């Protein structure tokens, strides 16, 4: 342990040699050096486990009055504290960046998700070096640090296997160990995983019972066991950030079946039931009012009868997904308890990084990629009914209806993305620390925010905020430690001023009052939003209106004006200004002012390259293009992928099958268009080519396929429908193999190229692109869904 006098405001702690006698011979009896002491935090510093779920609304969990069983959250709440006024930013990456840095999301460059980054300081997705992360601070103070799960704080141009890794968890963020994914969402059965900065495959397949949440728990338990076995006197900081319950809602059928019939009455009735449970549980004041359903959300009774069983099943699957997640979180906590370390482990269990996701359309979806590509009409009620038993399975990439998201945000208005209202930002949070909190099973209603976590952890550990990190002077934390509330439920709230903003949805909280304005509805992206000055502001008195049910702006215009001015002051202070609700401009790197990896219309790739995101590969959608590969065929029955992009839910692959050159185009997992040469390729060196002649005339059209060997055509084929917008949210491109889920009918294990070697692969796109025909709002809608 570092001496008590060691200053911890300069990190890393400087090495200061102790003056003393220097002898010539080490055998001299006057030779003396102080013993080497490993760096440790102050005595008694707790272990820290921060759990962050994804896309879980305030009203989902039984811990906060919901219908979805979360016995682990319930157990922690019974022995700890429940915070019913804890807030996030209303969106994924901004919440995560704010959590890990103790500063507002715009202060650390995350006014929006990384795909929308601009050159503006509040939206560039680049954390300034003046705002060091919590894990880095803890590591420099002697903590062991680890992260498991989702990281969406890496800009697309930094997310290739070549980094640079400054923004990666195991790079500059400060985690000594990372196991998880770098994206906004993941296929729970076939995720694109990283260990440290290196891509790795899941340890087993979906058919063998793989699920990401279970895997994350296994890895976390293993790491904690090893850490305590080898360094028992060193506390750990573990960040367990699940991909659940973000879509796709993947969970084994038996978990979803636990909720058979629970949601048959529909979202209106479910919302009413949750509201009454919340009041009975004391989670919200007894006098609370339930805000009326907005007209943008259809009533359950107005949904077609043939859709209701499908919609109910969507919610059953989501419920099973959340309970399954809670169960595996319990395994991690049980492992800590079995080692005798639970009493001095500070646990934050944050049930959601924002409100529930209303990005699944009114009907929900079986394969989100259909909606992402503007092809939701392919998922007819008849189709959805035919796959109702497959929701949540490896064959699905599913999401639930907007109506369920609204119900899961009970008792508040709106959902994820809507930073103006509590439905987007208020997330139930549990704090458990037996050694530091005497109170058990109590409610805390002080206003708190995700930026309060970092200062709380430092105070609990007895570590000061650093003034310098890596030679750079630090700006102070913008959050407030919650420790004052741990053992005093009546303590006045210390975090009494907070702005909120996301794509123009904005507001401010000050000493019980909130002034808010919704600028954009998450699922209504037709046309441009109104000018900011025309937004209608609302005013709520939180002392008597917990749920923001009664807008009193017309009764108290002076108070509204006061808070509007306060919002502008805070927005200016924290880089929120200029407000930015642009759509297509922010998705085009050149217009947004951010770098891009890919330039020009050609790209050379080589054997062994893989885990390339769509941002790492030239865009071949809505245009003619070709692939040419130089290969050395060693065996006449050579088999495997030359190059593949995407997976089961959409993509393409050029491959060899028993020596035959083949191509497959997979449209949404619904249609597979295959082209196959009749003859084998001779042993020897060859140039093989795939050419796609796009029909033109719009987006997502078909085209003619030609396969050639050494310039001679060997097969022709046809693709009728193509993806206009995206292959996948997290599947990748790979050379010499397929990865994740297979594009074609081959298995992943059989996709590895054998009997042939690849010298290079070159992609070339034509000049007939129809990308300019993509509606800017469609681009915006797509990007907002994948976060």
Segments predicted by a language model, with ranges:
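Formylglycine-dependent sulfatase
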Residues: 1-533, 537, 542, 546-565, ...
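Hydrophobic alpha-helical segments
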Residues: 460, 546, 570-573, 764, ...
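Middle-to-C-terminal accessory/interaction subdomains
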Residues: 560, 568-587
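Extracellular glycan-associated modules
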Residues: 578, 583-787
